[in-house]
A protein has these predicted regions:
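Ligand-binding loop in jelly-roll beta-barrel domains
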Residues: 102-128
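Glycine- and acidic-residue-biased ligand/ion/polar-headgroup-sensing regions
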Residues: 68-86
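Short acidic-glycine-tyrosine-enriched beta hairpin
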Residues: 56, 86-103
Length: 141
């Protein structure tokens, strides 16, 4: 649960920093001294980031799709089932995450018999929706 709180805090911080930087209309100071960090760090522009929270009922899933700038999924509740084209199905539990590289065709959703709440972080760009995931594909056959 602690890991979920940390991941949720990170996602919310990214969304908040996107808003604050955009509202200020000022680029962050490169390499500014900050007593909370050791070494040079830079707050990067997050204007294209988006964070969404979605609930999937047991067995619900997306169609095959890709994101032209990638996607990060975080499991808040339940279990997530995902598959990247040409790879085996993978399941993740609470506090675990999965990154999908740009333009990689994949699907994700809840496992059979258990609901899922996921956070998805988008990096801008577009989603290309493809065909539905069949029951056989969902079951790994």
């Amino acid at each position: 649960m602690k890991r979920v709180a940390v991941l949720l805090s990170l996602a919310l911080a990214l969304a908040a920093s996107t808003y604050w930087v955009g509202e200020a209309q000022q680029p962050p100071a490169a390499g500014a001294d900050d007593p909370h960090f050791t070494g040079k760090t830079v707050v990067m522009d997050g204007k294209d980031l988006s964070v969404a929270r979605r609930r999937f009922e047991p067995g619900a899933r997306t169609a095959w799709h890709s994101h032209d700038r990638g996607q990060l999924l975080l499991v808040e509740e339940g279990r997530l089932r995902t598959q990247k084209k040409g790879q085996a199905i993978k399941e993740l539990g609470v506090g675990e995450s999965d990154y999908t590289a740009p333009n990689l065709v994949h699907w994700h959703g809840a496992v059979p018999g258990q609901a899922l709440v996921q956070l998805n972080v988008g990096f801008g760009g577009e989603t290309k929706w493809l065909e539905p995931v069949t029951d056989a594909q969902y079951q790994g056959r």
